[in-house]
């Protein structure tokens, strides 16, 4: 299903966190969650079913959350001995997560943490680890704004979130604003580089998560699964650990909130996704990829995924907060960018894509809506739900033929799924709409479309009819405005090429004349 560009579901970031509460914990020294520690291996099992009317208990899976370098943003700081410039990652993280069905059960608010653990429909069960150390009962006071947030993702369970007599009430309400959203495909891509096959039906098969690991930060990584015993988590997160601000955006799976960690005072973006919607849309695999890939990425132009946790209703991703919101919001306000700003933005995104491609990761959904703007016009590539990672020894030009030598019916079915269109219609390359094999060059095509949209204000193949858009893409029917810079046209024409092998490389983009001649005019606080 393709959504029209003027659909009300197109996301727009809104106002930042309410600063009235930002100074509550200024004197707090922070907790171990936000100290620089190596990422610990985690091995957990979960059970998932549709939300029940019970008091939710949250369980967390915490990655390292460093102290921010700048105000109001949770950016990464690590030991200089463990990184090279802004390209670094932890090779020790190896996570194995399992979704399995469970029977309906109930629990009371006064139950012990072990009973709460066993009654949750989405349960973590680490090996050789006491349950009391893994979770904690959520009997703390919770404001109405938190309950209001949870009920927005699942209205049927909203009454279960306000039954406690200990909870405070608040008249504070969050404001929402939406913009027309670009047409996107809704079919979940079935790409995977793991031998474990994800069955869309939770009642018939388990879903195993295996986090990507790497021996070096510069080599292409491969996906692996581990069953070793995990150490004690550094710290568990619950909704009680955060104060909620305004809504930053909303989508089909839930909303994104600006939150403040009470103990440390750090600001984050909390992405909330309804479990029922994830199961109904069969997007478990997409969520798995997003967590696997993004949690291992450490780059100045990529949004950090610090941690994730869940309760009986929702799954929560704790993300780096970008104070200026989406790039699309700024583009819509200014109509288009000049050559200086556009060239700087293309340079930053190219740096992020080079970092991803060196690690065998294809983003596959590059567009202004998935690019965040932080302080000093620093861009952050986000939303890795459509991304995929390929093995080092895999033929990168034949991603969908990972099981080409095996001919079992089940594998043939998986092969067909890998041909599914993913991403945004306006940014799809010809090889994807024609169901051909694709590789890293799909991101290069999308980079050319992004460059055109930043300079012109709209994608080159935009049309009122989906079939017309397909025809324009297949023929590469692109028209340039007369006022467009000649060097910019040259760059776009070398990126938006039908033959993937003839597209300009990312390193050549950095050295293109359009980038070189505008680079001295960029703001001095960016890439000195």
From Swiss-Prot:
Enzyme class: transferase
Keyword Repeat: no
Species the sequence originates in: Candida albicans (strain SC5314 / ATCC MYA-2876) (Yeast)
GO cellular component, as recorded: chromosome passenger complex; cytoplasm; kinetochore; nucleus; spindle microtubule; spindle midzone; spindle pole
EC number: 2.7.11.1
Protein name, per record: Aurora kinase
Record-level GO BP terms: attachment of spindle microtubules to kinetochore; mitotic spindle organization; regulation of cytokinesis
Start and end residues of each Protein kinase domain: 242-515
Listed PANTHER family: SERINE/THREONINE-PROTEIN KINASE IAL-RELATED
Compositionally biased tracts (Low complexity): 18-29, 59-94, 105-120, 185-230
Biased composition (Polar residues): 95-104, 129-155
Stored InterPro entries: Aur-like, Kinase-like_dom_sf, Prot_kinase_dom, Ser/Thr_kinase_AS
Protein's cellular compartments: Nucleus; Cytoplasm, Cytoskeleton, Spindle; Chromosome, Centromere, Kinetochore
Amino-acid positions noted as binding ATP in the UniProt annotation, renumbered to this chain: 248-256, 271
Gene: IPL1
Residues at the catalytic site: 365
Matching SUPFAM superfamilies: Protein kinase-like (PK-like) (SSF56112)
Alphabetically ordered keywords of this record: ATP-binding, Cell cycle, Centromere, Chromosome, Chromosome partition, Cytoplasm, Cytoskeleton, Kinase, Kinetochore, Nucleotide-binding, Nucleus, Serine/threonine-protein kinase, Transferase
Family note: Belongs to the protein kinase superfamily. Ser/Thr protein kinase family. Aurora subfamily.
Function: Component of the chromosomal passenger complex (CPC), a complex that acts as a key regulator of chromosome segregation and cytokinesis. Has a role in error-correction of aberrent kinetochore-microtubule attachments to ensure that sister kinetochores become bioriented and connect to opposite poles by promoting spindle assembly checkpoint signaling.
Domain of life, per lineage: Eukaryota
């Amino acid at each position: 299903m393709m959504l029209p560009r003027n659909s009300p579901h197109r996301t727009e970031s809104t106002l930042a966190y309410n600063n009235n509460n930002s100074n509550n914990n200024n004197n707090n020294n922070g907790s171990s969650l936000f100290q620089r520690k190596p990422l610990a291996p985690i091995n957990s099992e979960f059970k998932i079913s549709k939300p029940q009317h019970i008091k939710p208990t949250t369980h967390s899976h915490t990655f390292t959350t460093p102290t921010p370098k700048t105000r109001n943003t949770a950016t990464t700081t690590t030991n200089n001995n463990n990184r090279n410039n802004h390209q670094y990652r932890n090779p020790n993280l190896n996570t194995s997560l399992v979704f399995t069905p469970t029977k309906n059960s109930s629990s009371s608010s006064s139950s012990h943490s072990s009973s709460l653990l066993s009654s949750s429909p989405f349960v973590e069960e680490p090996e050789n680890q006491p349950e009391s150390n893994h979770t904690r009962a959520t009997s703390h006071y919770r404001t109405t704004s938190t309950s209001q947030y949870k009920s927005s993702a699942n209205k049927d369970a909203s009454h279960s979130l306000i039954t406690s007599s200990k909870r405070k009430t608040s008249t504070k309400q969050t404001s929402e604003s939406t913009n027309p959203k670009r047409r996107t495909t809704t079919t979940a891509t079935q790409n995977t580089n793991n031998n474990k096959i994800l069955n869309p039906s939770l009642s018939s098969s388990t879903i195993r998560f295996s986090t990507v690991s790497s021996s070096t930060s510069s080599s292409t990584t491969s996906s692996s699964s581990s069953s070793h015993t995990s150490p004690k988590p550094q710290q568990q997160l619950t909704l009680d650990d955060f104060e909620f601000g305004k809504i930053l955006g909303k989508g089909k799976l839930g909303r994104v909130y600006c939150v403040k960690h009470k103990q440390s005072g750090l600001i984050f973006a909390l992405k909330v996704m309804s479990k029922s919607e994830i199961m109904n849309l069969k997007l478990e695999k997409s969520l798995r990829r997003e967590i696997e890939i993004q949690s291992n990425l450490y780059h100045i132009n990529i949004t950090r995924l610090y941690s994730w946790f869940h309760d009986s209703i929702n799954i929560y991703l704790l993300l780096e907060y970008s104070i200026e919101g989406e790039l699309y919001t700024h583009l819509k306000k200014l109509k288009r960018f000049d050559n200086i700003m556009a060239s700087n933005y293309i340079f930053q995104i190219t740096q992020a894509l080079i970092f991803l491609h060196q690690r065998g990761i294809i983003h596959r959904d590059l567009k202004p809506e998935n690019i965040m703007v932080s302080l000093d016009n620093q861009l952050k590539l986000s939303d890795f739900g459509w991304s995929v990672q390929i093995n080092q020894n895999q033929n990168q030009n034949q991603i969908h033929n990972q099981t080409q030598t095996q001919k079992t019916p089940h594998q043939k079915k998986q092969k067909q799924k890998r041909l599914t269109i993913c991403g945004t219609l306006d940014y799809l390359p010809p090889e994807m709409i024609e169901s051909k094999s694709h590789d890293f060059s799909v991101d290069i095509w999308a980079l050319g479309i992004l460059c055109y949209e930043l300079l012109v204000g709209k994608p080159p193949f935009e049309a009122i009819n989906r079939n017309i858009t397909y025809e324009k893409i297949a023929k590469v029917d692109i028209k340039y405005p007369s006022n467009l810079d000649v060097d910019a046209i040259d760059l776009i024409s070398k990126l938006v090429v039908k033959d993937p092998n003839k597209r300009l490389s990312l390193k050549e983009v950095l050295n293109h004349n359009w980038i070189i001649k505008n680079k001295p005019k960029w703001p001095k606080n960016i890439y000195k």
